[in-house]
């Protein structure tokens, strides 16, 4: 299930584009997630009241959380699958405190791919998309395994 060196390079190349503007990428990913899967909003007390896309775009809190999410994910992706230390606290908080189901991690993975396709069509062709999907699946599978260890059936 691991990625080849070439696949990791494709992932990290496009991730460099994300890091050049994390706030707008993070905001777009969360808006895409909430629009595509409104039920996910219920897990976010500070965003539940945001009903329209305009309200979401105007929310500094949402933008800030998008930065947090993509910064954490970037740290994990840069470990090229050797992300045990980074994953453990994330799985702990998402399983025990936030109670985020694995399905929602799938939804946000789809949102990330969607936003990258939209914002970077020239740098995110079929090979890069395949590599990113594989990297995000590896992340989700490892999160699910940690959830299981923690007794969370998310």
From Swiss-Prot:
One of its GO terms (molecular function) is heme binding. Its main location: cytoplasm. O2 binds at residue 65. GO terms for biological process: removal of superoxide radicals. The keyword Transport applies. Pfam families: Globin (PF00042). It comes from the Eukaryota. Gene3D superfamilies: 6.10.140.2100, 6.10.140.2110. The modification Phosphothreonine is found at residue 68. It catalyses: Fe(III)-heme b-[protein] + nitric oxide + H2O = Fe(II)-heme b-[protein] + nitrite + 2 H(+); H2O2 + AH2 = A + 2 H2O. It is found in: Cytoplasm, Sarcoplasm. The modification Phosphoserine is found at residue 4. The keyword Transport applies. GO terms for cellular component: extracellular exosome; sarcoplasm. Nitrite binds at residue 65. Heme b binds at residue 94. It is an enzyme of class 1 (oxidoreductase). InterPro entries: Globin, Globin-like_sf, Myoglobin. Keywords: Cytoplasm, Heme, Iron, Metal-binding, Muscle protein, Oxidoreductase, Oxygen transport, Phosphoprotein, Transport. Its EC number is 1.7.-.-, 1.11.1.-. Residues 2-148 form the Globin domain. Belongs to the globin family. Monomeric heme protein which primary function is to store oxygen and facilitate its diffusion within muscle tissues. Reversibly binds oxygen through a pentacoordinated heme iron and enables its timely and efficient release as needed during periods of heightened demand. Depending on the oxidative conditions of tissues and cells, and in addition to its ability to bind oxygen, it also has a nitrite reductase activity whereby it regulates the production of bioactive nitric oxide. Marmoset, woolly monkey, and squirrel monkey have a minor myoglobin component that appears to differ from each major component in having Phe-Lys preceding position 2. Monomeric. This is Myoglobin. It comes from Callithrix jacchus. The gene is MB.
């Amino acid at each position: 299930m691991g990625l080849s060196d070439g696949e990791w390079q494709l992932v990290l190349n496009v991730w460099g584009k994300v890091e050049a503007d994390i706030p707008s990428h993070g905001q777009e990913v969360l808006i895409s997630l909430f629009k595509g899967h409104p039920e996910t909003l219920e897990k976010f007390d500070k965003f539940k009241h945001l009903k329209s896309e305009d309200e979401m775009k105007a929310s500094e809190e949402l933008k800030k959380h998008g930065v947090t999410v993509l910064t954490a994910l970037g740290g994990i992706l840069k470990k090229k699958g050797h992300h045990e230390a980074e994953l453990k606290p994330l799985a702990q908080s998402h399983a025990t405190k936030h109670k985020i189901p694995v399905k929602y991690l799938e939804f946000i993975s789809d949102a990330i791919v969607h936003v990258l396709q939209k914002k970077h069509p020239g740098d995110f062709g079929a090979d890069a998309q395949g590599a990113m999907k594989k990297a995000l699946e590896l992340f989700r599978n490892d999160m699910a395994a940690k959830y299981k260890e923690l007794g969370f059936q998310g």
